[in-house]
Amino acid sequence: MTSSTLSQPIKQRGWFDVLDDWIKRDRFVFVGWSGLLLFPTAYLALGGWLTGTTFVTSWYTHGLASSYLEGANFLTAAVSTPADAMGHSLLLLWGPESQGDIVRWFQLGGLWTFVALHGAFSLIGFMLRQFEISRLVGIRPYNAIAFSGPIAVFVSVFLMYPLGQSSWFFAPSFGVAAIFRFLLFLQGFHNWTLNPFHMMGVAGILGGALLCAIHGATVENTLYEDGEQSNTFKAFEPTQEEETYSMVTANRYWSQIFGIAFSNKRWLHFFMLFVPVMGLWTSSIGIIGLALNLRAYDFVSQEIRAAEDPEFETFYTKNILLNEGLRAWMAPVDQPHENFVFPEEVLPRGNAL
């Protein structure tokens, strides 16, 4: 028997390997390579939002008070979009608009682009974090894929929509009441609620909530009686091998109610993933359509008949009049820099009035 004197060459560990080990070390808050993007951008986005809602006015961009310092509360404070005249400028602090003057930067709305762009990158960093940890733990990356839904909504609403319009001004400001104003704006100027992509989004989100409630209730209903404690939750051990609820009983229950039921846990849970994420994706596609000013359903025949026949009106024609009212009364206040003036005779009056 012969023995080989050959030996495997020892791979030299470089600085990258050492850094890779350190950055992926098991610690209380995992960092990882994704953390290099996530943590700085999330910190700056949140810090910018807190700074803006606390101190920064929207007087120069919207003619509004929007900070705690001016008397706004949590629901009415916001980091407002830049002035319409700024177009799609990134509004860098050192750019030609502000020239390094931070007060001027605040006045022009520079915090909004700061929060929007850092917020978008932080969401992407969080998605990459889920990919990275999935790889390290050895599981499939469906959490990251599901999180693409919120990312698609954020990017379409806060970035793609204003890019299709004349400026960042028409994006939503970062605040509760500001988002509600944006919803009314979308309805008045785009008839958003009649858009089929919005309908699919509503079906996905509400359908996902319904599936979540049904699934949770069904599991709670079919738990095994496997503990002596007064609280059934104490009977569960994270490392136990046996099932904690009866899929067979759950299947029998829903088969009796609907005549059809899930018999495959994997398909059931994929469906619970698919429905809400598809709703988010479809609504994002719809928002991009609005960015391009694409029209959805226009039932022109009903509008013509309503204009000719004082006794004919449908819920659709009433909604069209409501949209006209939103535009007519909202635009002068919403866009004060345009100096809109609508005489009384052009304001919408429905047949029922």
Curated annotation (Swiss-Prot):
Cofactor binding notes: The D1/D2 heterodimer binds P680, chlorophylls that are the primary electron donor of PSII, and subsequent electron acceptors. It shares a non-heme iron and each subunit binds pheophytin, quinone, additional chlorophylls, carotenoids and lipids. There is also a Cl(-1) ion associated with D1 and D2, which is required for oxygen evolution. The PSII complex binds additional chlorophylls, carotenoids and specific lipids.
Organism: Synechococcus phage S-PM2
Binding site for pheophytin a: 130, 143
Binding site for chlorophyll a ChlzD2: 118
InterPro entries named in the record: D1/D2 (IPR055266), Photo_II_D1/D2_sf (IPR036854), Photo_RC_L/M (IPR000484), Photo_RC_L/M_CS (IPR055265), PSII_PsbD/D2 (IPR005868)
GO MF terms held by the record: chlorophyll binding; electron transporter, transferring electrons within the cyclic electron transport pathway of photosynthesis activity; metal ion binding; oxidoreductase activity
Gene: psbD
Name of protein: Photosystem II D2 protein
Annotated keywords: Chlorophyll, Chromophore, Electron transport, Host membrane, Host thylakoid, Iron, Magnesium, Membrane, Metal-binding, Oxidoreductase, Photosynthesis, Photosystem II, Transmembrane, Transmembrane helix, Transport
UniProt GO BP: photosynthetic electron transport in photosystem II
Cellular component aspect of the GO annotation: host thylakoid membrane; membrane
Enzyme Commission code(s) on record: 1.10.3.9
Entry keyword Acyltransferase: no
